[in-house]
Swiss-Prot record:
Pfam families: 5_nucleotid. Keywords: Hydrolase, Magnesium, Metal-binding. It comes from Xenopus tropicalis (Western clawed frog). Substrate binds at K234, E235, A236, I237, R238, D239, V240, H241, V242. Belongs to the 5'(3')-deoxyribonucleotidase family. Signal peptide: none annotated. Its cofactor is Mg(2+). This is 5'-nucleotidase domain-containing protein 3. Mg(2+) binds at D104, D106, D372. Transmembrane segments: none annotated. The keyword Cytoplasm does not apply. It is an enzyme of class 3 (hydrolase). The active site is at D104 (nucleophile), D106 (proton donor). InterPro entries: HAD-like_sf, HAD-SF_hydro_IG_5-nucl, HAD_sf, Pur_nucleotidase.
Length: 534
C-alpha cells in the first residue's frame, strides 16, 4: 500500500469544493476543522508500507502533508485575516442593553508612550541606590521594553521569573533567573504565597528591574536574600507613584507621555451624543487626571461624565463599605460636607461601590465598566455586582498583527500538521521509524520555539503557551465579557451590536466548523469587513 496522503488530500479538496459550491462561499480561514481532521487522520487510512521501507513510507507521508498544507491550507488561512481593531467576546453581550459606561483612567482613557516605563524603571532604580543602599553599579542597567510581558509569575524565594499556563504548569524555556534562562525548568508551579503574578501594564518595569538587580548580584557572586530584593523593588516602584514622582513628570511633559488622545475623545463624544451615562473611577489623583483629560478631551471634559471619582483605592473601593465619598474642590481642596448626591461636573475622592450604587442606582447588567487590570478593575464587579466588563489589552493589536503574517501562518499550520503526523505515526515502534519520529519531535520543538519568539524572545505571547492558554488569559476569560486593544475599537460598532463568543471545540469534540461559518456569518470581524460595521 502506498501513502494515504494523496487520497486524503483529494478527499479534503473535494469536501471543501463541495461545501463552497453549496454555500457559494470560500472557506473561512478559521474554519479549519476538515483540514486538521485530514492531517490528524492520516495514519488511520493506512496499513503501512508493503515493502517494509519505513523511512521511505514516513518521509513520503511527511512530504505530502507538508505540500498539501503549504499549497492549499496556508493560502486559505491567509485569505481571511483577523482585524486587530475588532472586539472579542468571552460572553454574549448586547450593547443595546448597556445604559451606563464606566472607565478606569490609566491605560483605558489615557494611553502612555514607552517613555513612561523608562521613567518608572530609572526612578525606581535610583531609589534603590539612594534610599536602600544598593550598589551604584546597577545604574548601568537600562530599561528594555522587549524583555518581559504582562501576566508572568515571580517566585519570591527562588528569584525566578516564569510563564505559567492555565493549568498551573510552567512553560518550558520561559524561566529566568536574572536576565538568563534557566534550562530544563518545567513542571507544576508551586502553591502558596511564594508566587506573585504581575498583571498590570505598570508592572513591566518592575519585572525588568527585578531581573536586572538579580543579574548584577549573580554575575558578581554577591550573596543576597531574594525576598528582601523583591520587597525593596516593590517598595521603590510603589514610591514612584505614592511620592508623586510619576505624576509630576507626566504633568510637566504631557505631550511626551500621553498618546492617542483623539481616539479616546471620539469614543466619549459618541457615547455622550447617544445619551449614555458615563462615569470615571480611578486610583490616580485629581490634578493628574484633570491635566490628562484636559489634554485628551479639553477643559470641559467633566461635562461628558455624570460621576468622577479619583484616588478610589481599587480594589478596596469595591469591597470596603466604611469609606465615605469626599468632594474635591478647586486646587485639590477636600471638603468636609456629607455627600447626599453625586453631582455632574464635580470630582469626588475615595468612597466605596456600595454607596456609589445607592446614590446612582446603576446596578447589574445595564452597566459596562472598562479597565486594564483584570483583578483590580474587573474581578469584583463581575463576581459580586453583576456589571458587564470590558478589558483593555494594548498588547492585543501587535499580537494579532504578528498572527496575520505569512511567516506565523506558515509556521503554525505546519506545526499542527507535524503534530498530527506524530500522533498517528507513533504506532510504528521499529528502530528505523523511531529515528524518523525523533527527528520530527526535534523539528516540532524548533517550530514551537520559533512561533513563541515571534511575540517575545523570552516569554512568547501573553495569551498562550505552546498549546494551552496562559494563566493570564484564563483570568481574562473569567472576568471580562469582552476585550479589545483600546476603547477606540468601539467606534467600529453601532450601539445595537451584539457580541457573540466564538464556539471552539473541546478536546473530546470533533473539530468541525462552528455554526457561525455554517450560516455564512463571521462573529469575529475580518480585516476587509470592518468598514461594513462602522
Amino acid at each position: 500500500m502506498t501513502s494515504a496522503v494523496p487520497l486524503l488530500s483529494r478527499w479534503c479538496r473535494a469536501t471543501l469544493a463541495a461545501r463552497k459550491k453549496l454555500t457559494h462561499k470560500a472557506e473561512p480561514a478559521f474554519c479549519k476543522g476538515i483540514w486538521w481532521q485530514c492531517v490528524r487522520s492520516l495514519a488511520a487510512l493506512s496499513n503501512g508500507p508493503e515493502t517494509g521501507d519505513m523511512r521511505g513510507y514516513l518521509t513520503s507521508n511527511y512530504k505530502e502533508v507538508k505540500r498539501s498544507i503549504n499549497e492549499e491550507l496556508v493560502p486559505s488561512v491567509s485569505s481571511s485575516l483577523l482585524n486587530p481593531d475588532a472586539i472579542f467576546a468571552n460572553n454574549e453581550m448586547s450593547l443595546e442593553d448597556i445604559e451606563v459606561y464606566g472607565f478606569d483612567y490609566d491605560y483605558t482613557l489615557a494611553f502612555y508612550s514607552k517613555d513612561l516605563h523608562t521613567l518608572i524603571f530609572n526612578t525606581a532604580r535610583d531609589l534603590l541606590i539612594n534610599e536602600h543602599r544598593y550598589p551604584k553599579e546597577i545604574r548601568s542597567y537600562e530599561y528594555d521594553p522587549n524583555f518581559a510581558i504582562r501576566g508572568l509569575h515571580y517566585d519570591v524565594h527562588k528569584a525566578l521569573l516564569m510563564k505559567i499556563d492555565s493549568f498551573h504548569y510552567i512553560q518550558l524555556g520561559t524561566v529566568y533567573r536574572g536576565l538568563n534562562v534557566v534550562p530544563d525548568f518545567y513542571g507544576k508551579s508551586s502553591e502558596g504565597n511564594t508566587l506573585k503574578q504581575f498583571m498590570d501594564i505598570f508592572s513591566l518595569p518592575e519585572m525588568t528591574l527585578l531581573s536586572c538587580v538579580n543579574e548584577y548580584f549573580l554575575k558578581n557572586n554577591i550573596d543576597y536574600e531574594p525576598v528582601h530584593l523583591y520587597k525593596d523593588v516593590k517598595e521603590a516602584i510603589r514610591d514612584v507613584h505614592v511620592k508623586g514622582i510619576l505624576y509630576r513628570a507626566v504633568e510637566a511633559d504631557i505631550e511626551r507621555y500621553i498618546c492617542y488622545g483623539e481616539r479616546t475623545q471620539a469614543v466619549l463624544s459618541k457615547l455622550a451624543n447617544l445619551g449614555k451615562k458615563m462615569f470615571l473611577i480611578t486610583n490616580s489623583p485629581s490634578s493628574f487626571v484633570n491635566k490628562g483629560m484636559n489634554f485628551i478631551v479639553g477643559k470641559d471634559w467633566r461635562d461628558l461624565f455624570d460621576v468622577v471619582i479619583v484616588q478610589a483605592d481599587k480594589p478596596n473601593f469595591f469591597n470596603d463599605k466604611r469609606r465615605p465619598f469626599r468632594k474635591v474642590a478647586e486646587r485639590g481642596i477636600l471638603l468636609w460636607d456629607k455627600i447626599h448626591h453625586l453631582e455632574k461636573g464635580q470630582t469626588y475622592k475615595q468612597g466605596n461601590l456600595f454607596e456609589f450604587l445607592k446614590l446612582t442606582g446603576w446596578r447589574g447588567s445595564k452597566v459596562l465598566y472598562f479597565g486594564d487590570h483584570i483583578y483590580s478593575d474587573l474581578a469584583d464587579l463581575t463576581l459580586k455586582h453583576g456589571w458587564r466588563t470590558g478589558a483593555i489589552i494594548p498588547e492585543l493589536k501587535s499580537e494579532i498583527e504578528i498572527m496575520n503574517t505569512s511567516h506565523y501562518i506558515t509556521t503554525v499550520t505546519w506545526l499542527q500538521g507535524l503534530t498530527g503526523l506524530l500522533e498517528r505515526m507513533q504506532v510504528y515502534r521499529d528502530a528505523e521509524s523511531q529515528m524518523v519520529l525523533q527527528d520530527w519531535i526535534k523539528e516540532r520543538q524548533e517550530m514551537r520555539d520559533l512561533a513563541r519568539k515571534m511575540f517575545n524572545r523570552q516569554f512568547g505571547s501573553i495569551f498562550r503557551t505552546d498549546h494551552n492558554p496562559t494563566y493570564f488569559l484564563r483570568r481574562l476569560s473569567r472576568f471580562a465579557d469582552i476585550y479589545m486593544e483600546s476603547l477606540s475599537c468601539l467606534l467600529n460598532y453601532d450601539l445595537h451590536h451584539t457580541f457573540y463568543p466564538k464556539r471552539t471545540p473541546l478536546q473530546h469534540e470533533l473539530p468541525v466548523c462552528s455554526e457561525q461559518q455554517n450560516t455564512g456569518t463571521f462573529r469575529i470581524p475580518l480585516g476587509k469587513e470592518m468598514a461594513q460595521i462602522k
